Amino acid sequence: MRDSHSHALTSVSTESDTTMSLFCRRLRLEIDLSRGDVSEPILPVGYRWLEWSPELLDRHAAVKFRCFETEQDGQIFPSLRSADGCRRLMDYISGHAQFVPNATWLLVCDGIAQEGVVDCGSIQGLAPIPDSGAIQNVGIVPEHRGRGLGRALVQAALRGFLASGLTHISLEVTAANEPAVRLYQSLGFRVTKTLYRSVDEC
């Protein structure tokens, strides 16, 4: 999802430090799954899920880079700016003690003729505190957007968290990414906090 709204970034300086610090405005959204089931995701014809396995790490990293390389988050977050950065990020997520494989999915499309299978979306999950899950890096490659795949990815992750006994789920999104914010809210997420992240920390 592309977004070029300038209000996502804020410059801050102090009297004691003339260096300008760049911040991005982020929203934390949360959903409580203990009150109801999550609808089963519906994929268009030709698309299917690949559940997590370590052999898919490089494919997750590659599709993550394709999802974010031309997007605002790809300019803001160092880990999303390069293929190597996305590989390191996937190493970190999948090697984390609180990694949730059930909430981690690769979305593929069975291409036609010489194209073969095309990786077109990715999502990961962590469980940073008891009973709680955190969605990481929802991404659909540009040429497959507008087909409801982002919604399906989030639903698949939510069902995976539930299957792992996690009912309080959160995520963060750049505030200027209004289509993503609307998507999450339509699934039942609500904004609980506004955060200002230093770009150097992102």
Give the role of each language-model region.
Residues T104-L106, Q114-L126, A134-G139:
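Conserved beta-strand in the GNAT
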Residues R2-C24, R147, R151, A175-K193, ...:
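Conserved active-site alpha-helix within GNAT-family acetyltransferase domains
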Residues R48-G74:
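A short beta-loop-alpha structural element at the N-terminal edge
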Residues N137-I140, G146-A163, V181-S186:
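Conserved acetyl-CoA-binding loop-helix of GNAT-fold acetyltransferases
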Residues M1-S6, F161-E172:
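Conserved GNAT acetyl-CoA-binding A-motif
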Residues M1-S53, S198:
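Acyl-donor-binding surface of acyltransferase catalytic domains
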Residues P78-G116:
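Active-site rim helix/loop that mediates acceptor-substrate recognition in acyltransferases
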Residues P101, A127-I135, R145, S164-L166:
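A conserved beta-turn-beta hairpin within the catalytic core of GNAT-like acetyltransferases
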